[in-house]
Amino acid sequence: MKKIEAIIKPFKLDEVKEALQEVGLQGITVTEAKGFGRQKGHAELYRGAEYIVDFLPKVKIEIVIGDDLLDRAIDAIRRAAQTGRIGDGKIFVSNIEEAIRIRTGESGLDAI
């Protein structure tokens, strides 16, 4: 099993969710996040004063899937989240040793 963590622009969430559903994924976890990468922060005006905003709003998507869906899920996220501009985000993949459904006690792929 693999865990995909994708940090994307918030306005791309619906497109990514739909793309993942088309691949056959049944559930995702979404968390609001703030961060910066190469694009750093940006300046905003508020009541005539300029402020530097260090952290930009992002959305973090977490998915645990079987190894067989990994490449399709990554491709779906990339295609749906890409704008071609700085700050499109990152995708991280890690191994999951075990998954357990709390309600039923199912484990492994049956739990996801």
Regions found by a protein language model. Give the residues of each.
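Positively charged, small/polar-rich N-terminal and surface patches that mediate targeting and assembly
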Residues: 1-112
